[in-house]
Amino acid sequence: MTLHKKPKHLPSNAPLLHADHPRPVTRREMIRQGFLGGVGTAFIPSMFSLFTGRANALVASDIQDMNPACTLGTESLQKIPFICFDLAGGANIAGSNVLVGFNDQRDVLSTAGYSKLGLPPDMIPTSAGDNVDSELGLEFHATSQMLAGIKDSFSTNRGNTDGFVIPARSENDTANNPHNPMYGIARYALAQNGSFDENNMGSWAQLMALVGSRSSMSGGNSMAPADLMVSSLQPTKVDRPSDARGLINTGSLMTLFNNDTAVAAQVLEAMARMSDDKLGAIQLLTDNAADARLKDMIRCGYVKASDIAASFSSPDILDPTLDERIMGDDQGNYPPIFNGDDLSGPNRGDYLKTASIMKLVIEGRAGAGCVTLGGYDYHTGERATGEQRDYKAGRCIGACLEYAARLNVPLMVYIFSDGSVASNGMTDDSMLGGGKGVWTGDNSSTACSFSLIYNPGGRPQLAGTTRQIGTMRTDASVNTGSSPAANNVNQLVDTVVLNYMALHGDQGQFANLMGNSLGNIDQWIKFQSLGYNFAG
């Protein structure tokens, strides 16, 4: 008789080794299996970066006049903040976390289908609402650990939240899935009169358009669609508070002038004036039009550097660990989103990464952000490992929603993963396993993505009758013909961008900006415009 050793669950940040996977070699392979957490340093935008601004510009008027097209800022948010979570490795989303059905979320699948999604017969959701949690609008399984994590971080005005789920197949364990939608979001946000022009971009955010926790063209683990990428908008890499602080580092200027912001700004303004005089006297390129564009970019770099120095008294303003709306205050007005145990435990790096990016995006310093969480290739032959990692992801997602609620601003959060997992029906009856099905292998046919939307004015209003885009078959596999997104990751991104635009009431611009890949777009829009007053 052959004896099989029962698999043990792994700590929340332990690396994953699978007999059916090659030893990880590349950085992306190491991230999805949890060997690397995606840590690193920030790349401060150079003067050639075309990041947009919205600071209350205090820079001298003659400096602004050097390049009128150089956007220095506005007095409020310009678009709804957008944060995406890239769960590297192929996480479970469908069934055990977000409910999916053969038409809508409560259109039940077969018993065998739910078993494949890790749910034994006594945990199957029903159309009557058994094992269903609908507090956030979008329906989750009542025992979802991702939902448990969201709720543990997010308590303020939960009823102002709703969302949608998209059954969509994607390849397992590969960063080559073009999942990341941030460039599409940026093209819409920076468009002028419904048209995007890299050389004539509008106003969006204060310091940079995009921010991500990885040093990649997408800012995350998964790629961005190649036809949407804009080299000048490559996400600035931030994954810790010191990176965020470094975004407004003026070098030794502040030290030289005893941290006097006004003097430092005047020095930078003087440099801008000298540079402008010099540029007017030389020819940099033989092509006159190209020469003019290059000089405008150089002038804009100096103008923006002056504006940043004039607008920020200290890098402390970007540090999430110094923000009592995140860390808590002595008066008890703000309970900590991440407490001392969170920030001294094994998930400290992921929580600080999330806090750094959410603060930049939700305060309007960046337009959109991507947080990569590694180690989601968790088909380890037991369930507890996946449950703990789903809970951690939920804590990070919930933190973003809570921070938006505390600042009274809207937020769209989007969660995706490269592929997914499936269960063979065996259960993990340990305390952490909860009697749910063990994850035994990759399975791209069970994959899906989802979004949660927070609206300070009340729960987002459905545009139709369902919260699901596309359908599942009763055996819990994606019906690949049910939506343009179901079997095409590029069109999955288009679908997400469409729904983001619709939250602003701008879906009519979609074809001009993104093409006609989705056909009749009305059927794929899940929510009406939030009607948020961006001038307030």
Question: Which role does the model predict for each range below?
Answer:
Residues 2-395, 399-403, 409, 446-536:
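Feature for exported/extracytoplasmic and membrane-associated proteins, marking the mature portion
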Residues 100-102, 430-433:
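Glycine-rich, phosphate-binding/catalytic loops in enzymes
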Residues 404-431:
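Metal-dependent active-site segment of extracytoplasmic phospho-/sulfohydrolases and closely related
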Residues 421, 433-435, 476:
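Membrane-proximal bilayer-interacting regions
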Residues 425-432, 438-444:
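Extended amphipathic alpha-helical segments with heptad-repeat/coiled-coil character used for oligomerization
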